[in-house]
């Protein structure tokens, strides 16, 4: 069971909204979100209702302002709890072309720089064979984030991206 608390103001001040399950639109309860406390579980939060727009992955901890979760502004509207599978291994295959074609790169560990490790700047498709992964738009786990659970992603839009730029990625662990 997870629990996340959203606050309108920085440093856990102002009105708050608590969630212990997925919520497709909490904007009616909060006009803005400037701080978050994750009491348990891992969550993906979205800037728009119905789990759309920029996404941010948060684990247990305190985020006193939106820069701490790499947010671009104080707008958040929906959230989903991430469900881990016990004893999960981690394995991902990245492809430099869509539909699982072209050069394939495989990893079982975090990668702070896709360019340094694989000599490519773009991921056009991927298969998450085990575990939960986060793609980042920039090296060293910065920029836009994309949560990828076990499954196949034939093109960047399948994981929520508009372009194939993936500069780093890491495993999401409990």
Swiss-Prot record:
SUPFAM superfamilies: gamma-Crystallin-like. GO terms for molecular function: structural constituent of eye lens. GO terms for biological process: lens development in camera-type eye; visual perception. Gene3D superfamilies: Crystallins. Keywords: Eye lens protein, Repeat. The keyword Repeat applies. Residues 2-40, 41-83, 90-130, 131-173 form the Beta/gamma crystallin 'Greek key' domain. Pfam families: Crystall (PF00030). Residues 84-89 are annotated as: Connecting peptide. Has a two-domain beta-structure, folded into four very similar Greek key motifs. Belongs to the beta/gamma-crystallin family. Crystallins are the dominant structural components of the vertebrate eye lens. This is Gamma-crystallin S. It comes from Cyprinus carpio (Common carp). The gene is crygs.
